[in-house]
């Protein structure tokens, strides 16, 4: 859930313009996000309140699904991504930003594939291995500690790659370091599927920029990708864009669970366990409460599934 929602403002890239008087006053433009490892080390375990399976992303709803069954919608998001990869048995698949591995576990439980799941947060590897203990998957997972923009893996060695609410942690409006490495690692004809939030317009109101800025800083996101810049970057690196699907309304039922889950979490931590939250955890909680309001800014922001295929 990251994630997984703001133009977090890469100093080296073109910035979204803030509608209204030109001023450097926006907090989103002046404060850096929390460090990724710090965020997930201090607040990562709180995702347990969101998903018993540690699905660290929003869900995908279809008309036949119960909108009150949050975990099923979270798992459905993973399956929607996998369906777009069009995998075959024996394929090697790359999970770019795996968290504690819920999507990877879902994939290998159902398909005879080999997944290399990458995270730069060390404790997530240990947790992923513990959560996989006792399962009997059809496929297999290699848990890899590393930076998904600079992996020591051979080129053209994967038949598919996906990233669910993790590409947002890469730098820049186009997420070029992320795209470049994915393109290097994919075999010709292989697909990349990205599920994430994207900025739709360059100009945004100042009040909306403030909300977005708080969320990006609190969720260790420099900025969310600009949709047009991201798709152009894919093409530039030899990944032909096959589909850009706005699924914002598909994730809305899961987003509506956020206030309930957050308030239950606060009640449990503050009132029952009498634990005070550190700065990273408070930032995460407040950002979660802002999320439904950010999602209403449909003119400026959307949640997309982007599918691209490496040219032959």
Regions found by a protein language model. Give the residues of each.
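Short, glycine-/aromatic-enriched active-site segment of Class I SAM-dependent methyltransferases
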Residues: 198-221
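N-terminal auxiliary segments of SAM/dcSAM-dependent transferases
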Residues: 2-49
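Conserved alpha-helix/loop element of class I SAM-dependent methyltransferases that forms part
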Residues: 58-60, 68-89
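A short acidic, Gly/Pro-enriched loop at the edge of an enzyme's catalytic core
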Residues: 149-161
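A short glycine-rich, Lys/Arg-flanked "PGG" loop and its adjoining helix->strand segment in the class I
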Residues: 176-191
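Class I SAM-dependent methyltransferase SAM/SAH-binding core
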Residues: 92-94, 100-150
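Conserved Class I S-adenosyl-L-methionine
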Residues: 245-312
């Amino acid at each position: 859930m990251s994630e997984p929602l703001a133009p977090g403002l890469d100093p080296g890239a073109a910035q979204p313009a803030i509608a209204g008087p030109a001023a450097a006053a926006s907090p989103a433009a002046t404060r850096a996000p929390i460090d990724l490892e710090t965020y997930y080390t201090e607040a990562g375990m709180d995702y347990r309140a969101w998903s018993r399976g540690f699905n660290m992303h929003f869900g995908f709803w279809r008309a036949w699904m119960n909108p009150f069954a949050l975990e099923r919608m979270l798992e459905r998001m993973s399956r929607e991504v996998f369906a777009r990869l069009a995998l075959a048995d024996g394929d090697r698949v790359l999970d770019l930003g795996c968290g504690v591995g819920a999507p990877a576990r879902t994939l290998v439980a159902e398909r005879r594939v080999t997944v290399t799941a990458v995270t730069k947060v060390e404790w997530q590897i240990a947790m992923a291995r513990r959560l996989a203990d006792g399962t009997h998957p059809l496929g297999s997972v290699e848990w890899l500690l590393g930076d998904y923009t600079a992996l020591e893996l051979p080129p053209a060695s994967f038949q598919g790659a996906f990233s669910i609410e993790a590409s947002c942690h890469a730098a820049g409006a186009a997420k070029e370091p992320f795209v470049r490495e994915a393109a290097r690692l994919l075999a010709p004809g292989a697909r990349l599927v990205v599920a994430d939030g994207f900025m739709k317009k360059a100009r945004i109101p100042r009040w909306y920029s403030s909300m977005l800025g708080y969320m990006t800083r609190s969720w260790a996101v420099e900025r969310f990708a600009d949709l047009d810049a991201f798709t152009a970057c894919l093409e530039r690196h030899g990944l032909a864009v096959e589909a850009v699907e706005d699924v914002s309304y598909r994730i809305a039922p899961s987003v509506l669970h956020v206030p309930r889950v957050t308030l239950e979490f606060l009640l449990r931590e503050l009132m029952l366990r009498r634990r005070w939250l550190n700065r990273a955890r408070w930032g995460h909680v407040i950002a979660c409460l802002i999320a439904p309001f950010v999602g209403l800014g449909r003119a400026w922001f959307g949640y997309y599934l982007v599918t691209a295929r490496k040219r032959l």
